[in-house]
Amino acid sequence: MTLLPIKLPPGMYKNGTELDAAGRWFDGNLVRWVEGMMRPVGGWQQRTTTALTGKPRAILTWRDNSATRHLAVGTHSKLYAISQSSVITDITPTGFTPGNPDATVGGGYGTGTYSYGFYGVPRPDVGSVTPETTWSLDTWGEYLVGCSNYDGKIYEWQLNPANKAAVVANAPTGNTAILVSNERALFALGAGGDPRLISWSDLENNTVWTPSSSNLAGSIELQTGGRIIVGKRVRGQILVLTDIDAHVVSYVGQPFVYQSEYVGRACGIPGPNAIAVQDNFAVWMSTRGFFTYDGYIKPLACEVSDYVFSDINTAQLSKVCAVNNSQFNEVWWFYPSASSQENDRYVMWNYADNYWSVGTMARSAGTDRGVFSNPIFVGTDGILYDHEVGVNHAGSTVYVESGPVQIGNGDNVYYVNELIPDERNQGDVTATFFSRYYPNAAERSYGPYSMTNPTSVRFNGRQINMRLTASPNTDWRVGTMRLNAQPGGRR
């Protein structure tokens, strides 16, 4: 008899064929690895019970000067302030222009010349995408500032629930996004409707925008063929991403105040929320891959990119949102699969251990813990959820499945009659095995087995896949399992 350890490295591999994932985890949902041991992602619970009006696209948390905690959420049609006790207040500005819940694509069905091209062959990229409406939110001191990319005006809310957010006087209109610099200038991106223009206010005064010898207001026109999508504070600078490239804006003092530098090509971002900033680096999902910025732009190798980008709704790609989960050194991206108009899947990267994981979850915005004790995600249903709370996953199946585990070189048939589990609490997880003789041969399943120590099983094959399924609401742990296997012949 041979004791075969099933010791697979953390993370999933979903590029190429299933055989390419030999010796790796291949699929799963709501699992992570901590110090090499597999466990479930934390559960969630509702923070609010009333759905917000409109599609939520942005969320911000902060403390005011009295240490009171605040939360703001922007939807395509509303702006909300939510107190630390979860009281929801509509602070939508008077005269605000609601936008679009979904992205729209020009050049679709009914456009172009009839019978042009061949059936089943993708047409040239001649259409234009109008993104769904989202907000960029930041703080000006203890006050909230924000801008909807559809309405284009810059608003400020001064914490009084009885008052709506109000237009910032003298600020440009028709803007794409805003942010506040480390030097306390309010930035307008895509300012005045110019997709390449960046304007900023005087330092410490967000109502002075006209440059003069007595202030530090100004503007920069980026040298790019793209349009500005988003800006984020990173490493003491401002990283500005367009739909095709990347630029860095740095403070240089008088007379220019700020200057821009082109730092990367073919690394654009599809939507303003697809980027996360963690400590001293930024990471974002592009249209066909991932990139990081830590002073230099670098592509990020992704072991599940085939799976993600082969089944994604490219027309709604601007809805992708990235969320830090610093407690576990993770960045999560929520994205719409090809058959969905809204985000229904996630891809997660652990930047400390450099592994990837995938699963299903419907979230449209989120924020890391810090101001509040837990990460807060916003569902596509308009409900806010506290995450990493217990292990209740609202009925979602928690599982992980391996790629082929070949015994030896895979040329001999093995007969397996016993499983020796490695669980923290036996019975929390069931095991199902799938065996086949050749990579494309018919697959046979065995189980599920409720694991005891040891567990009697009976199956054979040249390659074996294993699926572990967790019982609901269990905080399980799985280490290195072993199979008791007897080698047979080559047939």
What are these regions (language model features)?
Residues 79-80, 152-154, 195, 246, ...:
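Structural signal for beta-propeller blades
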Residues 1-91, 109-118, 122, 126-129, ...:
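Beta-sheet repeat architectures centered on beta-propellers
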Residues 100-108:
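Surface-exposed intrinsically disordered loops and tails
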Residues 42-60, 95, 117-130, 161-319:
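Beta-propeller and closely related beta-pinwheel folds
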Residues 93, 108, 112, 147-150, ...:
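Beta-hairpin (beta-strand-turn-beta-strand) motif
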Residues 72-75, 146-149, 188-191, 240-242, ...:
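Conserved beta-strand positions in repeat-built beta-propeller and related beta-rich domains
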Residues 91-100:
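Long, contiguous N-terminal structural blocks used for assembly/anchoring
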Residues 140-164:
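Hydrophobic or amphipathic alpha-helical targeting/insertion segments
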